[in-house]
Amino acid sequence: GSEMCIRDRYLRDGEHIKAAEAAAASKVPAAEKKDAADANAPLDFEKIAASIPAIEVVDMGVTYKQRDPESPKFVTIGERIHCISPVIREAMNTMNPEPILKRAAEQIKAGATYLDVNIGPAESNGPELMTWAVKLLQENFNNVPLALDTANKRAIEAGIKVYNRTNGKPIVNSADAGSRISYIDLAAANDAICIALCSADGIAKDNEERMMHCHHMLERGLSLGMEATDLWFDPLFLVVKGMQDKQMDVLNAIKLFSDEGLKSTGGLSNNSNGAPKNVRPIMDSALVAMAMMQGLTSAIVNPNDLRLMETIKSCDIFKNNELYSDSYLDA
C-alpha cells in the first residue's frame, strides 16, 4: 500500500547517507572512540533491575483505561513529569515515588494518552533511573504508555527493556536530522516510535529545509525496517512573541507531513511562551484546532489545561476520529 511506496521512494536515497557517515566516523579521535566503546558495552539489565528500589503499588484513585494503539484519535503526551520541575527533580534524585505518581495520576485523570518521562541527561544513573520510572508508572497505572525523554541513549534502552506495550509502543523522545539522528537507530532496534525533530543544527529556515530533514530521517528509519507511521515528525512549534511571521510555516509543514501519510507531533505550548498566564490556554487551544485541521496527529501538552483538552476532544469529533455522544467531553 502507501507504506510500501513511501518505503521504496526513500530507500533509493539511502546509500549517500551511509557514505557520509563512514567518512565522518573515520575522523573521530582515538580517546572519543574509547568513550564510545565504553558507552556501547552491553547493559547488564539484571544488575540494573537489582539496584533499584522495589516498586510499591499505591492506590492513586485513577486507572489508565485500556486503549487501542490503532485508534485514529489524537494522541496527547502529558508533559508534566519533567526534571526541570524542582519537585520532580528532587523525586528523581532520591527515587521518591510520591510526587511522580501524583503528577501521573493528575494527567491520566485529565485524559492524557501517553506520559512523557523526562529524566534530563542523567549521566550517572540514567539506566537505573529510567528503569525505575517506567516500572513505577506502568505498575501503578495499568501499563500507561510512555515517552522516554532523555539525551541518555542507554537510559532509553534500559527503560524499553522493562516496558509493557499493552497500550502502545514506547516513544523515543527524540531524534533530529543532526547530532541526534542515531536515536532513530535506537527506536528501530527496539520496535519503538520515534519523535523526529525536523531540524539539524538550529531551527529550519523554511519548509523546504524542514522537508529535507523529514525525508532524511524517514529514509533512515525505513532502511532500518521501521514503519513510516512509527516516525512522528515534529515541525518545531515556535514562540509567537518574536516569531509571529513563522506560525503559518509551521502549520503548512504539518499539512506537508499529512499529505505524505506521515504522523506528526510537537511541543505545542511553545507557541505561547512568555504570554500572560490567562492568555496561554486560549492561544494553545486555537493553535491545536488549526494544527489538527492541517493533520497534526499528536502533541506534547499539559493535559490539565481543560480548555485545550476540550478543544482536542471536539476536533476529534469533527474529524470523525470519535463517535459523537452527548457525554463525549467526559470520555
Locate the predicted segments by residue.
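Glycine-rich, proline-tolerant flexible connector loops at the mouths of alpha/beta enzymes
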Residues: 110-144, 237-244
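Catalytic beta/alpha-barrel core
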Residues: 116-121, 144-152, 169-178, 198, ...
